[in-house]
Swiss-Prot record:
Protein name stated in the entry: Protoheme IX farnesyltransferase 2
Misc. remarks from the entry: Carbon 2 of the heme B porphyrin ring is defined according to the Fischer nomenclature.
Organism of origin: Pseudomonas fluorescens (strain Pf0-1)
Pathway per the UniProt entry: Porphyrin-containing compound metabolism; heme O biosynthesis; heme O from protoheme: step 1/1
Reactions catalysed: heme b + (2E,6E)-farnesyl diphosphate + H2O = Fe(II)-heme o + diphosphate
Entry annotated with the keyword Protease: no
PANTHER family, alphabetized: PROTOHEME IX FARNESYLTRANSFERASE, MITOCHONDRIAL (PTHR43448:SF2)
Organism superkingdom: Bacteria
Subcellular compartments: Cell inner membrane
Enzyme class of the recorded protein, top EC level: transferase
GO BP of this protein: heme O biosynthetic process
Length: 295
């Protein structure tokens, strides 16, 4: 048991990806007026809650992880940290994260963190991941919470922009997750996880991927059409979304589904990262605010 093991079970890669989306939502809402304390609380608080969820997930998935090539050497599977200690660790992380969001940001940000946690740990990890082909869809809601947390940490309200972020990031999760399930098909099959590609076939999954990416593309454009983001954001969102859609379309003629799915997965990360960055840089300041600060 070492510090490295405690870091590993929080899944740092997942935390980093979520932190980027928190920042995107935060800066979109801030519109150039950043409260540093609230920003740090949103980033650190969300990171702690996500880390907590990941540790709980590691605890719950020990039996599944043992059957999968990719996960059979994880810390808890190998017994490098005891289950009891991991559960205490996860609880401390979660409580600290929610408390930080509640005290420094606002109760609404803390509420969305709790909702995301409950969906991920309670509904997805404990039950739906193992029992339902729709587990990915329900789990996608938890993955969409970080940008919403970042946004409401500033606004303290759930408006159209927050709803758009929730829809955007939920829709993004679906093709992203299905792509993983395709190139890790044998792992999911061995662990009897009923993801769509395993349960209903890769060809059916390809159709769903195409539909979800199309819906995601439309949702991303709504930030500009609703007056929350600028034209530079729109250009990047349209370009990334259309190319991702094209990549999905090429899946119907793919010679090797594993290679195709891996490329689709990698581009999904580039896409959501680019949008998070553009939301941070190309927010749209309302006309009334511009008039307020006019000389």
């Amino acid at each position: 048991m070492s510090l490295k093991h405690f870091i590993q079970i929080t899944k740092p890669g997942i935390i980093f990806g979520n932190v980027l989306s928190v920042a995107g939502g935060f800066f979109l809402a801030s519109k150039g007026h950043v409260d540093l304390a609230v920003f740090l609380a949103a980033m650190i608080g969300t990171s702690l809650v996500v880390a907590s969820g990941c540790v709980f997930n590691n605890c719950i998935d020990r039996d599944i992880d043992l059957k999968m090539e990719r996960t059979k050497n994880r810390v808890l599977v190998q017994g490098l940290i005891s289950l009891k200690l991991a559960l205490v660790y996860a609880t401390v992380l979660g409580v600290a994260g929610v408390a930080l969001l509640y005290k420094v940001a606002n109760p609404l940000a803390a509420l969305f963190a709790v909702i995301g946690f409950i969906i991920y740990v309670g509904f997805y990890s404990l039950y739906l991941k193992r029992k339902s082909v729709h587990g990915t869809l329900v789990g996608s809601l938890s993955g969409a919470m970080p940008p919403v947390i970042g946004y409401v940490a500033v606004t303290n309200s759930f408006d159209m922009a927050a709803l758009t972020l929730l829809v955007m990031f939920s829709l993004w999760q679906m093709p992203h997750s299905y792509a993983i399930a395709i190139f890790r098909f044998n792992d999911y099959l061995a662990a009897s996880i009923p993801v769509l590609p395993v349960k209903r076939g890769i060809q059916v999954a390809k159709k769903h991927i195409l539909i979800y990416i199309l819906a995601f593309l439309v949702a991303t454009l709504m930030l500009t059409f609703s007056g929350y983001a600028g034209m530079s954001y729109l250009a990047v969102a349209a370009a990334m979304g259309m190319y991702w859609l094209y990549m999905a379309w090429t899946g119907y003629k793919a010679v090797d589904d594993t290679v195709w799915a891996r490329k689709l997965f990698v581009f999904s990360i580039f896409t959501i990262t680019a949008l998070s960055v553009m939301m941070s840089l190309d927010f749209k300041v309302p006309t009334e605010l511009l008039l307020t600060y006019a000389p």
